[in-house]
């Protein structure tokens, strides 16, 4: 439609996904371009040109957006190659014109925390890491993240940014499927090469005047992330990294970072030291729980529930390396859990590989409820908490397009909304440390769950409440998380790492994902506004439901 508005004579568009193709035809008609734009309901690589083809003649301008986080991961090379071979005249204009992938070697112990499990220390080493894991290069997949949100003091560039791959989309140079580049460059600083930051940019025009840039020093509002490739220790080569230690396959990078969180580990260790004695017999119900080894090091006998095969293999390595095979028994199935008479303490971080939003880790509560409530437990309480926020960018993933560049796209909004209402959960998981937001209210409790008592499967919980809005702004979301109370003094949170102050930016835990409710209708709020909410919990199946509504008081 932009091309039609600029005066193009003939325009052919293609869309293979039937619901979107149908919607596109409707939008083209509603904006008055049905006589100028022909939509072909197939992939561009399936289109043919000729008398009985999809196009009567070749085009002289190509406009396409087939890029992803790694630039060419969505079939960009084959798409452009086919277009030049079949759909375009020679010397056609291609938008974008060129693409460049950049890389920069950096030193960062924070980034390294996402890649390799480190020993747990408390003055001395409590849990050592197997050499296989220490030497492993990690997963082959890059780690997508918003590098603009990584604090500048947490990494040191060791080399200048380098263009490693250049792609000429214009057709003047061939696009190769297999390409390898070796670069020789001088370091700008001494240090340990922990990782490679990678990003890309696009030259949109033939004169290289219009640049679409994804550069990590500039906060990006686009839906692309920069990404990280982590370097194998003390090895310089061009081989594809492959995990051979099980840990990188079993656990996400977020979980690996969580296992390396020193502050978090110290709180657990302090709480466990007060609770565990050499006579303790503990059941640990958490996937990939290194703290189970800490409990064993404190002298207790441990039953460790590990239902996931990959996680179980990883934990077996840790148990063997730390010489704890005589104190830790790994249990593969819930059916094989020890009898109540065999244990006197149940522990969980809690964390489960299958959990997406934080409260799904309440599976710990359900597992402990198989035992009498007289058996001591940790944590003792779970508090689901929330705060009203103004996101800087995250709300755009749910925001309607409305009118964009002068075109009415409301039909697309309706299609997406109907689909979203059928398939999307009103609360989704997001790593909020990557998405800036300011607090519009104080943090508030939704529900406190006493984990020392067994689940009452017959009790339906429904709670309502209101909280005041304490700062003016645009309330476009609610952030939700869980605080786990370990004992009367110590707790760990999967939410903010600092006290929430209304009107100030919230600092979130970088090693967990929080729950987010994004409003479909965004409200401008003042200190006269309130947030009303309701929460429903069905213990029979573990289902929870959140509802939020902004009330504006004149």
Task: Give residue ranges: language-model regions.
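Class I SAM-binding transferase module
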Residues: 1-554
């Amino acid at each position: 439609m932009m091309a039609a508005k600029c005066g193009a004579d003939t325009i052919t568009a293609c869309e293979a996904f039937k619901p979107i193709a149908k919607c596109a035809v409707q939008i083209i008609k509603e904006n008055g371009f049905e006589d100028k734009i022909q939509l072909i309901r197939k992939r561009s690589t399936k289109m043919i040109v000729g008398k009985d083809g999809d196009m009567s003649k070749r085009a002289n301008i190509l406009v396409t957006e087939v890029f992803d986080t790694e630039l060419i991961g969505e079939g960009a090379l084959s798409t452009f190659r086919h277009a030049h071979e079949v759909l375009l005249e020679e010397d056609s204009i291609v938008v974008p014109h060129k693409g460049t992938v950049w890389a920069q070697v950096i030193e960062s112990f924070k980034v390294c925390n996402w890649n390799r499990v480190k020993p747990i220390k408390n003055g001395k080493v409590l849990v050592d890491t197997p050499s296989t894991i220490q030497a492993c290069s990690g997963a082959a997949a890059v780690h997508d993240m918003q590098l603009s949100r990584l604090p500048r003091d947490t990494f040191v560039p060791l080399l200048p940014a380098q263009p490693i791959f250049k792609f000429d989309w214009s057709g003047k140079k061939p696009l190769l499927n297999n390409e390898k580049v070796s670069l020789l460059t001088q370091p700008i600083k001494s240090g340990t090469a922990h990782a490679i930051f990678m990003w890309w940019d696009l030259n949109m025009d033939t004169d290289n005047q219009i640049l679409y840039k994804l550069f990590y020093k500039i906060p990006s509002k686009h839906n692309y992330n920069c990404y990280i490739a982590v370097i194998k220790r003390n090895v310089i080569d061009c081989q594809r990294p492959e995990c051979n230690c099980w840990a990188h396959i079993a656990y996400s990078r977020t979980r690996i970072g969580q296992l390396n969180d020193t502050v978090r580990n110290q709180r657990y260790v302090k709480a466990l030291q007060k609770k565990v004695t050499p006579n303790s017999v503990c059941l640990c119900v958490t996937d990939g729980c290194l703290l189970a080894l800490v409990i064993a090091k404190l002298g207790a006998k441990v039953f460790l529930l590990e239902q996931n095969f990959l996680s179980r293999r990883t934990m077996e390595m840790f148990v063997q390396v730390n010489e704890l095979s005589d104190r830790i028994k790994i249990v593969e199935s819930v059916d094989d859990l020890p009898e109540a008479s065999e244990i006197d303490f149940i522990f969980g971080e809690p964390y489960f590989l299958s959990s997406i939003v934080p409260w799904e880790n309440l599976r710990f509560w359900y597992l402990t409820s198989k035992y009498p409530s007289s058996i001591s437990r940790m944590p003792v309480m779970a508090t689901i908490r929330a705060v009203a926020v103004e996101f800087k960018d995250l709300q755009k993933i749910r925001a309607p397009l409305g009118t964009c560049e002068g075109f009415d796209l409301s039909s697309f909004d309706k299609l997406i909304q109907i689909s979203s209402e059928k398939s999307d959960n009103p609360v989704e998981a997001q790593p909020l440390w990557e998405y800036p937001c300011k607090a519009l209210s104080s943090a508030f409790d939704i529900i406190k769950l006493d984990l020392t008592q067994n689940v009452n499967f017959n009790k339906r919980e429904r709670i309502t409440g209101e909280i005041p809005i304490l700062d003016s702004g645009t309330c476009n979301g609610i952030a939700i998380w869980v605080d786990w109370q370990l004992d009367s003094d110590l707790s760990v949170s999967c939410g903010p790492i600092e006290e929430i102050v209304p009107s100030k930016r919230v600092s979130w835990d970088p090693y967990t994902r929080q729950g987010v409710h994004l409003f479909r209708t965004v409200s401008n709020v003042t200190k006269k506004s309130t947030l009303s909410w309701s929460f429903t919990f069905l213990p029979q199946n573990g289902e929870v439901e959140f509802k939020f509504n902004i009330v504006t008081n004149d």
